[in-house]
Amino acid sequence: MGLAGTKVKQRFGLDPRNTSWSNDKSRFGHRYLESMGWAPGKGLGLVEHATTTHVKVSVKDDTVGLGAKLAKRSGTDDLETDSSGLDDFQRILGRLNGRGREVDEALEQKRKDNIINGKWGMHFIKGEVLCSTWDRKSKSHMLKTALEDESEVNFKSSKKRRQSGSEPSRDSTSHAKRMRGDESKKSTRDQSKQERKEKKIKTEKKEKKEKKEKKEKKEKKEKKEKKEKKEKKERDYGNRASPVEPRKHDQISNVGRLSARAKYIKQKRASVMDAKALNEIFMISK
């Protein structure tokens, strides 16, 4: 990992592979297996050349997935192998060691394998694996047996009815009459139901039409009233003899604490408005 990687503290026991337990032949497991015909060094099961070493158990103290450490150890981890710049570094080392061609071929083969076997590659399946499980003979035989069973059941049920029934003709005629009566009742019910449905549709259409007519009458009446109001307004404006004179400003009432100021402003305005008074002030003679 290097200096930038996370530091993992490893703990090794006195006997990490538990060889003291596996080599101790005086225990119950060894004695029981030997009584069943097993000998030390043999594999378990039908195949004798299977693995003969015991399974190593390791404590999982990290959050990585199962098998991540094995993939990293075998060099098949994508995160480790796909790091940028490692291929160039391997080529440089190969040239320095005099094995540049071998390293280039190995890296090229590795790149091709990643493309073919990677997530963007394709995995083909043999055609023999995709054979159909349809068997025409067995299917036809199954259909034939099913039809035979059904016909046998029908024959047995009809035989039982013939044996148990003592009034065949009378029951059949009464049953036919009942069926005809039920059918006639059903037809009358359906007819009355259809009539009620048609009547309901007609009443709904009539109500919709009446609502529409009322709405149109109301709109026409409102338009007429608006038009009459507009015409009346125009007539009143035309019949008026003279336009309304603008309202004159009321004189300021000299009431209150501002009466003296109002009086002074009024006198000043009057003197300014008088041309003769202005000529006398500015000593202009005409």
From Swiss-Prot:
Residues 199-230 have a biased composition (Basic residues). It is found in: Nucleus, Nucleolus. Residues 25-71 form the G-patch domain. It comes from Meyerozyma guilliermondii (strain ATCC 6260 / CBS 566 / DSM 6381 / JCM 1539 / NBRC 10279 / NRRL Y-324) (Yeast). Belongs to the PINX1 family. Residues 1-20, 148-255 are annotated as: Disordered. This is Protein PXR1. Its main location: nucleus. One of its GO terms (cellular component) is nucleolus. It comes from the Eukaryota. Keywords: Nucleus, Ribosome biogenesis, rRNA processing. One of its GO terms (biological process) is negative regulation of telomere maintenance via telomerase. GO terms for molecular function: enzyme activator activity; nucleic acid binding; telomerase inhibitor activity. The gene is PXR1.
